């Protein structure tokens, strides 16, 4: 984007003075609008936000975090629109991404608030580390859940084959009851809660 200039009126028609307009001005306006919209309901007023603008270090930190928040919010909205109509083989990947985006947005909400009340400052390197941590954690959790699901399916198929293909063996040996985690057994509370979380994103 090129530089913008504003012409200053002068009594001398042969001499024109120009003043460069910096992009930081529009970024600061965006940040002020964002903070006012998001935190007015929490009791942070426009005058409070303007006071933060005078604190250059705090405002600089807020300016660093805002682009990441806006980018993640756009990605979250895009995934949310695609989730309902996407092919089944794509849905699992989108569910992972929307969970990551939601977690990042929630965390950045806390970061904004803590910066606003002066609890701490955060640099761009720390934010990038935070994003990488979420990416790793959420992917790992999803992979673990998929492995657990595959184990469940394998157990169910094994039990079905034993009872349907060789019912006499089952009747004589009681092998079905001896198998761990029978189909009729209720799932553990932790696994049920995890599956419920995933199902919530698919609705």
From Swiss-Prot:
Keyword annotations of the record: Host cytoplasm, Host Golgi apparatus, Lipoprotein, Palmitate, Phosphoprotein, Virion, Virion tegument
- Lipid sites, type S-palmitoyl cysteine: 4
Q: Does the record carry Thylakoid as a key word?
A: no
GO CC, any one term: viral tegument
Known partners and oligomeric status: Oligomerizes. Interacts with U75; this interaction mediates U75 incorporation to virions.
Q: What does this protein do?
A: Plays several roles during the time course of infection, including egress of virus particles from the perinuclear space and secondary envelopment of cytoplasmic capsids that bud into specific trans-Golgi network (TGN)-derived membranes.
PTMs? Phosphorylated. Palmitoylation is necessary for Golgi localization.
Family under the similarity heading: Belongs to the herpesviridae UL51 family.
Origin organism is Human herpesvirus 7 (strain JI) (HHV-7)
Task: Identify this protein by name.
Answer: Tegument protein UL51 homolog
Q: Where's it found, cell-wise?
A: Virion tegument; Host cytoplasm; Host Golgi apparatus
One Pfam entry for this protein is: Herpes_U44
Question: What InterPro entries does the entry give?
Answer: Herpes_U44
The answer to whether keyword RNA-binding applies is no
């Amino acid at each position: 984007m090129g530089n913008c200039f504003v012409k200053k009126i002068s009594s001398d028609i042969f001499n024109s003075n120009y003043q460069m307009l910096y992009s930081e001005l529009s970024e600061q306006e965006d940040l002020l609008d964002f903070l006012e919209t998001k935190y007015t309901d929490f009791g942070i007023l426009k005058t409070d936000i303007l006071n933060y603008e005078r604190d250059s270090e705090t405002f600089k930190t807020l300016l660093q975090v805002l682009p990441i928040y806006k980018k993640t919010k756009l990605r979250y909205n895009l995934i949310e629109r695609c989730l309902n109509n996407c092919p089944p083989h794509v849905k699992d990947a989108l569910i992972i991404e929307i969970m990551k985006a939601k977690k990042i947005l929630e965390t950045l909400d806390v970061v904004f608030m803590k910066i606003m009340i002066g609890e701490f400052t955060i640099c761009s390197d720390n934010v990038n580390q935070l994003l990488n941590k979420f990416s790793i954690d959420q992917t790992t959790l999803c992979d673990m859940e998929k492995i657990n699901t595959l184990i469940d399916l394998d157990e169910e198929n094994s039990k079905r084959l034993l009872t349907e293909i060789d019912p006499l063996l089952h009747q004589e040996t009681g092998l079905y009851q001896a198998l761990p985690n029978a189909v009729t057994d209720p799932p553990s509370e932790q696994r049920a809660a995890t599956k419920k979380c995933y199902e919530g994103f698919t609705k």
